[in-house]
Amino acid sequence: MKIKSMLVGSLAVAVLIVGISVYAQVNRPYHNGSAWNIAFIRIKPGMNTAYMNYLASSWKAEQEAQKKDGNILSYKVMSVEGHTTGEWNLMLMTEYKDLATMEANQDKAEAVAQRVVGNDEAQIKGYKERAEIREVLGNRLAREIILEPKSR
């Protein structure tokens, strides 16, 4: 009987703790959306048309192939006003379903790049050519935050 009382008491304490922890959980007014890889580019002076020609041809072809194969959701090119010399003036944004999908599809994405752009040598050659017209100042991963409707 003593063991039964201890078990019932332990069960009651466990239920109480679980109840308190559930009650204590914060009700967040948002949920995670898609993930974005954002490249910050500085187009060199006088090279805007040359870089836009690359983006409208090879870069766009690769992005469309990645989208068709389900590796990405979308992509965007955002021109921004640079305020100081050497500051980035273009963002290349690639949208993924989530970070896990982005990581899981790396091999598939590389295969698409090989198919569309070419082998490693061709990709390196293109990167060197583009280095003459633009500079990659950095990349960031971002996660979209979807705000929930305000509850009444």
Residue spans for each PLM region:
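Positively charged n-region of N-terminal signal peptides that target proteins for export
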Residues: 1-5
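Short, solvent-exposed mixed-charge patches
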Residues: 151-152
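N-terminal, post-signal-peptide region of Sec/Tat-exported proteins
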Residues: 44-88
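An amphipathic, aromatic/His-enriched active-site/gating alpha helix that lines ligand/cofactor pockets
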Residues: 27-30, 61, 65-73, 93-143, ...
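Extracellular/periplasmic catalytic domains that process cell-envelope and extracellular macromolecules
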Residues: 29-33, 83-88, 132
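Bacterial N-terminal signal peptides
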Residues: 9-19
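Structural recognition of the beta-strand scaffold that forms the well-ordered cores
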Residues: 37-40, 74-76, 91-94
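Immediate post-signal-peptide N-terminus of mature secreted/exported proteins
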Residues: 25-50
